[in-house]
Amino acid sequence: SHRNILATLFSWALVTTLKREVDNADANQAKDSQTASEPQNQSAILHCVPLFHVTGSHSGFLMSIIAGRKMVMMPKWDPGLALQLIQDEKIGAITGVPTQTWDLLTHPDRDKYDLSTFKELSGGGAPRPPEHVKKLKDGFKDSEPSIGYGLTETNAAGTLNLGKDYLNHPGSCGRAIPPVTDVGIIDENWNFLSEPKVVGEIVIKSPANMVGYWKNEEATKEVFNDDGWFKSGDLGYIDDGFVYIVDRVKDMVIRGGENISCIEVETAIYSHASVQEAAVFGIPEERLGETLCVAICVKPSMELSEQELRDFLQDKLAAFKIPSLMQIAYEELPRVASGKFSKTQLRDIFVSNGKN
């Protein structure tokens, strides 16, 4: 019989909540997964993201329960402590945002620890710079980096990229997760775009999709069509089955009528050897509408000037995509609880400093 049960209420940004239906198909999938899993063969996982995000709750916590694997939880991200835990607890996997695995790879004390058990380098919640993929693979012996894409509204279901596919397509968040998740691209009128590499909004159809926003029918209708497809709010395209994210619809910077993808600019900046962290965003500007900004954390013992970075980016980006305002320092960038960079806080800093 069909069961219509309120399973979870997730709240984010302090103002929005959602609920999700669970029917027999969900329960059966969980049961099948549990039956197929042998706890003694499951490596321990380092859990370093909050449980109030689906990456932490679903990909980390619930899947660990289903698989019967040991889960080591960190109350706050600390790469030095994480390295110690990986050694002491024989951690085999990590689930978190991509910056966390990068923190481990570039930590000055990494070689002091026995990390031989550390193999599964999962990431989600934010893009991983393509050039980091091979560096992670080479830096952790016999490891397998992976990246996933999903949203709170899809209960983390979406795409997955791992193994040779990830090495060959490091800029992609992967293919749709089989067998029940479908991913498509639409235009602003809900027309599906079948041509490869045509940019539109990413939509996801899956039994894992939420029922809707709690007590907000209008907002729910805005993101679903009659066939159950959910509008992600992310711009992207599909090429040979692989999904590529261009940017959040709301995070595109529009400068003098030109659309600028923050992810594209960040990817170019991350290719500079001195850059540890980078966040690109826009702030209001009277004449052009928005000014493109970047905040950068430089690697320890490395140096980087604004002019050096501008010169470096000249043959990688169109002139209008090179940030006009730069903040280059050795301090880590501010983050929200999920581990992502807080671009809202960075915008406020730039505006309050009179950088516009």
Predicted segments with their positions:
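Acidic/polar alpha-helix N-cap and adjacent early helical turns
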Residues: 348-356
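Conserved AMP-binding/adenylation subdomain of ANL enzymes
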Residues: 6-47, 52-93, 107
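Conserved ATP/PPi-binding loop(s) of AMP-dependent carboxylate-activating enzymes
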Residues: 175-180, 191-223, 258-260
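AMP-binding/adenylate-forming catalytic core of the ANL superfamily
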Residues: 94, 183, 206, 211-212, ...
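Active-site glycine-centered loops adjacent to acidic/histidine catalytic or metal-binding residues
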Residues: 125, 150, 174, 234, ...
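Gly/Ser/Thr-rich phosphate-binding loop
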Residues: 66-67, 83, 88-96, 105-168, ...
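Glycine-centered tight turns that cap/initiate beta-strands
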Residues: 109, 117, 142, 179, ...
